[in-house]
Every structure is written in C-alpha cells, then in structure tokens.
Amino acid sequence: MIDESDKSLFRSTVDQQKPIDKDGVKNTVTSKSGANQLFQKYSFLYEPNISGSEAVIHYKSGLSSKVLKKMKQGNMGPTPSIDLHGHKVEEACQSLSKFIHFHSNERFIHIIHGKGYHSDSGLSIMKSQVVHYLKQHPAVLAFCSCTQEMGGTGAVFVHLKAHV
C-alpha cells in the first residue's frame, strides 16, 4: 500500500509537468533577444516544383567547402530530427519554425519531408515547401539532401548559424 505522503509527493511532481508534442517541439516560445525569435515571416508555396527523386542543395556565400562536404557525407554526428510525414503544409511550416527555434543551439539538424510519390503531379508538395521555407529562414546557412541511410532525397541536413 502507498502511504499518503508518497501520493502527495508524486502528485505535486506530476502536476508540474507539461505534455510533450509528438515531434518533440516545445509549444512555448520565450526569447530575451530579437536574434532568437521564432521565425514566422515565411511564405507558402502552393505549387510544387521539385520531384521526389531530385537532390537539393543550397548554401549561402562564404560557407566553408569542408562543412558542405561534411553535410553531403552525413558526417555531422548525432543531429536532432523532425519527421513531417502526414503534416499539412501550414502545420509543417509551424512545426519546422518551432523545431529550428528550439534547436537553435545546434549546428546541424535533420528534416524528413518525404519524397511525395503519392502526389498526383509526381512533384513533392512537402519537399518543395521545405526547400522554399529553408531558403527564407534567417538561421539557415545551408541544406542538402541526405545520404541514402538517412533518407536520401526524402530528407535534408540543415546547417544553422551559430547561436549568439
């Protein structure tokens, strides 16, 4: 039998906890500086323009070729990951914004967007939106399609600016 003091201690501890989203992203956003604010000024892309099998790469000028090579080979070590399968475009952008904000202290992240093989046009809606979104995000220095083991053309590695 559990005594009342143990029940009380357990209840007081559990009551202070908040549930975690399925994608592991905090729902609350608090920021002390403008540099670390949640990015919400993105635009949506409603017409897909990238096929599921197409490799993608984008980087800002001045990025080290060593970093790009490391990304292409998947040699970044463990990276936080988000899977956007099953999300609607708007939900995916919101989740992605929260995910990047939450992991702003990381240098690399992994985004699984899928290849969109079930789309009518043969073009990937989610992949096109993720690429469009990442090009707009101020914290993103580079991204490229993953190695086969990490999702191939259905996922991207993203290099984020160092958190200042």
Q: Which functions belong to the PLM regions below?
A:
Residues M1-F108, I112-V164:
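Long, charged, low-complexity intrinsically disordered regions
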